[in-house]
Every structure is written in structure tokens, then in C-alpha cells.
Amino acid sequence: MGGWGSFGLAPCRDQFMRPRVISYLDVALSWLPALAVLLVGCAPTPITPVMDGERKAIPLLAFYYIWFDPLMWERAKVDYPLLGRYSSDDREVMQQHVRWARQAGIDGFIVSWKSTQKLNRRLEQLMEIARAEGLKLAIMYQGLDVEREPLPIERIASDLDLFRDRYAEDPVFDLFGLPLVIWSGTWKFSPAEVAQVANPRREHLLILASERNTQGYARLHYLVDGNAYYWSSVNPETFPGYPEKLEEMGRAAHADGGLWIAPAAPGFDARLVGGTRVVERNNGETMRRQMEAALRSSPDAIGLISWNEFSENTHIEPSEKYRTHYVELVAGMRLGEVPDIINFESSEPAETQSAPDRSRALALATLALLVVVSLGAIAMRSRSVSPVEGE
């Protein structure tokens, strides 16, 4: 948003012996150009879209987490949501997330999930809300435990059967014909283990690997329906050949007809959960570069990392630290404009006045006040000042 700036009054000159009443009119009129500039300055800063033309047809999917409980916000966090330290059971919070995402041009959420009573309940609530709001869903199945060790194959197979039988037929999962499941952590499993789970279920589900390089994908490509790389910690300024690596991975997935979901993130900082790497956000430039690199890799979708991963600080959800900046930036990249969104303090539909509109209203009110004051001064002076002789 443009700044208010500072504007001086042009001096009123009486050297041609005009009536003093005119000088007050000059004062009033001298404000008009300044306020015109002010109004222009209140307009939102234009953002050049990186998803122009045919690129807009590429789905933008944000990774979404439903694991939050109020006590979780007390550990390993340096930023917090504008909506407060919520529980993922809070329906109004979830509904607001979905509405914000849709307004920003996000097509769907990739939901982190495995079958537990709590996560199933939350997934079902999200399905209902997303269906009503027109947001699509996919699943990132958490194949590793909290120690980053692989879950038993029998557990994974059972969970995917539950998903297939209970949820997969819902139209909210209709992104690529069949419901999409990204198996997180496939690099920890042998081809035989992946085959044991994937082969009997690919008739009903699109099962993607989550391999981190082409060599890893090559060992599984005939067992899965593509690859989705969750690369949240890359620094585009320092990683050599970063865009080329994504392009290579895209070609590998497409070589035998698989899907390729390319990653993009706004930044990264997982030091409070044991990490050491920090990728600065650079006021949105990091995300812009990562989005552009992802698009260059000819993806079938972009996996935006993330909506609300606050522990690794990849979130774009409106927050205390970044406010609405990253949702607005996504909207600008996706749509070419910042929408007049969002009542970010509310769970109501986003139909309230935006910050640029509020600034314009304030500027107009200021203009009106100046005109009224100036006209009042004119009226008072005109009663007491006679015309100058000779006019």
C-alpha cells in the first residue's frame, strides 16, 4: 500500500491585489492535487502475476495441517495466527481458512493425515466445509512417525483402505479423476513395501511418492502414479541448480505418465524443532522465486508449503508477525491483483472493507473536511472584506 506522504501548502500570493477571499479559495484548491495523489497512494500496490495465461490452469494446492490443539502453541513457535491459538476442531477457524484460501486463488488443500479418531473427525469437518466453499482436497499420508521412522506397512495399508472406503468417493477429492494421496516418507520404504501397499489400491486412488531426487523416484516410478516433493527448506539464492533440479524431477515423473507436484515455500526456520537451516522470506521475494521455479518445471499442480506449518515457519496463514502479507502476495501472483478481501479478524465471510478502501475513505473524509473549513473561511471573510478598487 502506498504511503501517505507529506504535502505542503502552496503560498497564497496577493501581489496582484485580488480580493482576499480568493486567497482562501486558493488555499482550499491547493489541497486538491495533494489529496488526489493521496488517493492514488492508497491504492494497493500492483503485483505482477507469475501465473499468467495457461499457467492459471495449474492447480495451486496448499499443504494444510489439522493437528493443532491449544497447548501445541506453547512449544516451538515464534509466530501465531491472527485467529488466535486455535484448535483444529474449531469449525469457524477452519471455515475462515477455507474462505481465505479460495479468495487468494488457492484451489485446494493437501491435508496431512493418518487415521486416528481425532484426525478423522477433523478431516470430516474439513470435507464438509470445503465442499460447501468449492475447495478441493488431497491427502498427504504421514508414513513416518514422530521419530521420522517408517510406520508398519500393515498400518499404512489399513489407513488407506479406510480412506478409500469412507472418504474417497466424496467429490471434494475429485482433482485428477481419482482421489490423490501423497505418501510422505517413501524414501524410507523398499520397493517391495511400496508395492505391497500401492498395487492393490491404485485402481481407486492416485498414490504419489514423495521422493527427493530422480534417483529415488527411479526405483519406485513403476509402482506409483507420480511424485510430490515437499522441499520446504531450499534456499533459492544458495542452492546450485535449484530450478534445474525441479525441471529434472518433473521430466522424470512425466516420462511414464505420472503426475508432478512441484514445491514452493515462502521461507523456512525450524531451529526450535531441531533444525539448523534458515531461509529468509525477504518480504516475499523468496516465495516469488520458488513459485517461478516450480512453474518452470511443468507441474501438474504446485504444492504451496504451507498454509499453517508454524513450527517450521513456512506458513502463509495471516499471522501476528506477517499479518495478511503472504495471502495477499499469493493472490497477486495467482490472480494479478490483491483482492479486496478480508476481514482477517473475523470468522465471517470476507465481505468487509479492505485496508485500501479504508484509506480511501479516510482521504475522502479529509478532503471533505478541508473543503468545508475553507468554504466556511471564505464565507466569513466575504462578509468583512470589500472588493479592491479598480476591479
Where are these regions (language model features)?
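Bacterial N-terminal signal peptides
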Residues: 27-40
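Hydrophobic H-region at the start of alpha-helical membrane spans
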Residues: 30, 360-371
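Glycan-processing catalytic domains of CAZymes
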Residues: 46-356, 361, 372-377
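C-terminal membrane-anchoring or membrane-association module
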Residues: 373-391
